[in-house]
Amino acid sequence: SFVIARMPINKAKYLTDYTYNYEYNLVFGGESYPMGENVYSIPNSWIVDAVNLSVESEFKWIVTAPSLDKGWTYCGKVDSDATRYGKSVRRKTLSTTSNGKKILKDTNNSTLDFTPEVKPSLMN
């Protein structure tokens, strides 16, 4: 998932106060492997917008709160398929104002709001 957030604090405070460590055991083939990492969190209240992404054939679950995004979209249909590169998702346009400003669709559901597998706009 990707988010756009407004950070109401400075960088130093964020890096100090919003870090956490997670740990779990990856169990595979009868073996258990301890896993973990130090990461940073972004409170949902700071998030302006979110999009959940997956390769279509590999989608498992939505990792954001439903208030942020109730759906998901994709840039490739099959993992490890070289044709999935050079693609993007693009938010759908509802309308365009008289001065040319696009009004974008935003229902907090990426399945409905984005067109998958489009050519990135900077490549046009």
Which stretches of residues belong to each language-model region?
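Intrinsically disordered, low-complexity linkers and terminal tails enriched in Ser/Thr/Pro/Gly
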Residues: 1-124
